Regions:
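Short, basic, low-complexity termini and linkers enriched in Ser/Thr/Gly/Pro
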Residues: 8, 238-240
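Conserved N-terminal beta-strand and adjoining loop/helix that marks the start
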Residues: 243-260
Length: 260
């Protein structure tokens, strides 16, 4: 289940970070077709499966064509396997397409073509893991739930702990941190994509994908610069990092005095 114990670390700047990221998100978020309430829950799930290990910019045309051809679970469930593989195109890992079709068949037959609305039911669907179930709960249904992927782990670790996240699967401490800093939702926010927890999940993920990247982070463009626990600096020449000429794995990480 998506549940963790609370971390031991005292977090003092979570509200300030959330406010800064929300402002940045509303001004700078990429206008992807499944965002801002424009896609069905099924469409959101399709986008999440397609985006696994694939850049979102590559996903958009495939998602548009896919949803026009198979707009719901019933349509995909009835499709020929060869057509499904062909439509997946160059997204990579075609097994994902077949698992998505298996998922569609379960949704069509067991849930009357409506995506289930609980985390446990989503997790039980073919090909759906913790991240995808949590993402659908947040992005499609507006539920307050911590979403944890590689980008979110990296951002939260850098911003709140002043260190890099470890590789591999998310640790219990990382999941606990994600749960601890998740904003409370405002009952007055009726639209699911406006709820603070949803904006938080999407903005942290977006920051990790576009600014707080793994190897060449754009610290000077970070909306939480001055709040975050550390930035990445080159001992002598920051410009080479900004131009992508220096691998951050070979750069000294500096905890910025006065930020935390």
């Amino acid at each position: 289940m998506n549940d963790t114990n609370e971390p031991n670390t005292e977090i003092e700047n979570a509200e300030a970070v959330a406010d800064a990221l929300a402002e940045w998100w509303h001004a700078s978020a990429r206008d992807l077709p499944w965002r801002f309430g424009r896609a069905t829950p099924w469409g959101v799930l399709v986008s999440e499966v397609m985006s696994q290990q694939t850049q979102m910019s590559r996903v958009v045309p495939y998602w548009n064509d896919w949803m026009e051809r198979w707009p719901d679970a019933v349509a995909l469930a009835d499709a020929a396997k060869a057509d499904v593989i062909t439509a997946w195109g160059r997204l990579g890992y075609p097994r994902r397409a077949l698992r998505l079709q298996e998922c569609a068949r379960v949704v069509a037959s067991d849930y009357d073509n409506k995506l289930p609305r609980t985390y446990d039911e989503l997790l039980a669907l073919p090909g759906i893991g913790d991240y995808t179930a949590s993402a659908v709960m947040s992005f499609a249904f507006g539920e307050r739930i911590a979403v944890v992927d590689t980008n979110i782990r990296r951002v939260l670790s850098r911003v709140f702990l002043g260190k890099e996240s470890l590789g591999g699967a998310a640790s219990p401490a990382e999941r606990a941190l994600a749960k601890q800093v998740l904003p409370q939702d405002d009952a007055s926010k009726c639209r699911r994509f406006d709820r603070p927890s949803v904006v938080w999940n999407q903005s942290v993920m977006e920051l990790g994908a576009t600014v707080c990247t793994a190897k060449v982070p754009l610290c000077e463009a970070c909306p939480v610069l001055g709040i975050a626990c550390f930035c990445i600096m080159v001992v002598r020449d920051w410009g080479n990092v900004a131009r992508g000429r220096v691998n951050v794995s070979k750069v000294r990480i500096v905890r910025c005095v006065g930020w935390c």
